Amino acid sequence: MPLPPSAAPDPIARFRDALARAAAASPHDATAAALATADARGAPSVRMVLVKSADARGFAFFTNRESRKARDLAANPRAALCFHWPALEEQVRVEGAVTPLPDAEADAYFRSRPRESRVGAWASRQSAPLGDRAELEAAVREVEARFPGDEIPRPPFWGGYLVAPERIEFWRSGPGRLHHRTVYVRRGDGWEVGALQP
């Protein structure tokens, strides 16, 4: 299959264009992606995250660093992301190594979050067992009492991660399930691009 005309040399620019089209077509959580990780034994797990930036460095997301995903990444620092935009009939898959983002970037993003989200970040022991909802609500009240104003510092157990892409695949629906697939593979400082069978 010949390369489609949209096979631009820069997959990050192509992704950002697709994301803009997805946000225009269906603005609710266009940045949501399935994040797949695996623990030290290779046991996989997947969940949705919001990707907050995509640039030449990679794809950034933020989370509790004591969560299952963070424990997986500490043991096995590789991950895959999958963006699916039904309104466009397109998806993008990203695979690569994962590293923690600098604290300064985590601080800046944390400050931009709504107050209730910052409170929730302190109150939730993400992925830990929960006895009942009252336990969590009590933790929220305790955090609100501790930080009565708008200045709520970033918890030391909360931060960001960067997926540095080594492989990015763009998929677009085609008639008769003859879909269009273009893959970019990192080669040194550049990208090798090619088409895949549907």
Swiss-Prot record:
GO BP annotations listed = pyridoxine biosynthetic process
The protein's name:
Pyridoxine/pyridoxamine 5'-phosphate oxidase
Biological role: Catalyzes the oxidation of either pyridoxine 5'-phosphate (PNP) or pyridoxamine 5'-phosphate (PMP) into pyridoxal 5'-phosphate (PLP).
| Cofactor binding note of this UniProt entry | Binds 1 FMN per subunit.
Q: Assembly state and interactors?
A: Homodimer.
Q: What is its EC number?
A: 1.4.3.5
Q: Which organism is it from?
A: Anaeromyxobacter dehalogenans (strain 2CP-C)
Q: Which family does it belong to?
A: Belongs to the pyridoxamine 5'-phosphate oxidase family.
